[in-house]
């Protein structure tokens, strides 16, 4: 599902970091080494069909690499 983030991400929490990330080997292979963390937060998103919803987002992030593999986990509204 493609989406666009409309508002800044709020309530950001770290879910996992380092070796506790299940796909750590894949992240390092695709994007390079770094201190990878899995994070979650909430933001208003615009979906492909134009609807705007509040969603919980999950993504991976490493210093110097940025946010990768962002996805909608669930809708909060």
What is each PLM-predicted segment?
Residues 1-77:
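Cysteine-centric segments in proteins
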